[in-house]
Amino acid sequence: MRIAILESIVMPAGHEVEFDRILVEELKKQGHEPVFFVPERFPFKLDYHCDVDYLDGGEAVSYAGVSRLKRLWLSLQRERRRIAWLNSACQKGADGKCDAVIVPTNSWRVMRSIRHSILKDSKVPFLFMFHGIMPKDRQRFCDGVKSLKEYPNV
């Protein structure tokens, strides 16, 4: 199977980079063909030796080194772009560019974005992975999961 990894978090290094590397290696070991779906001009920190397909919707948004006011503006921009990236990934799946999509880094905000995207009616399965949920976000997370139960490919 051709499995897309949708990555939109600009990461200097650390657990996201390592997690993606492990995911790619495991998919290859199981005989799958991983491909990355990423925002345009995405700054990879590691060469995963996979095909890359760029998503419509704008570049990835980073909060690194910005003021509180600018962060608020960027969070609105990131939300709008996240919906566009999800829509683009969904369309790529419908066009046969992958058999399934894994989204390895998520939050309750992503679940909110799903409800505002065409992804709820996706023809290909989307697997959203969550790790490191903050205790203060627990209820939002649980509510977000419940809100997506009616969508069979999410």
Residue ranges of each PLM-predicted region?
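Short hydrophobic segments within beta-strands
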Residues: L6-S8, F37, V103-P104, M129
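Short N-terminal targeting/anchoring amphipathic segment
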Residues: L74-E79, S88-V110, P125-M129
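A short, glycine/small-residue-rich beta-strand->loop->alpha-helix junction that serves as a flexible
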Residues: E7-R21
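N-terminal strand-loop element at the rim of the active site
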Residues: M11, E26-Q77, W108
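Alpha-helical membrane-targeting segments
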Residues: A64-N87, R112, D143-E150
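Extreme N-terminal starter segment of soluble prokaryotic enzymes
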Residues: M1-A4
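A short, histidine- and acid-enriched strand-loop-helix "catalytic/donor-clamping" loop
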Residues: P12, S107-V110, V124-C142
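Membrane-proximal helix-turn-helix segments that form the acceptor-binding/catalytic region
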Residues: N87-Q91, I133-V154
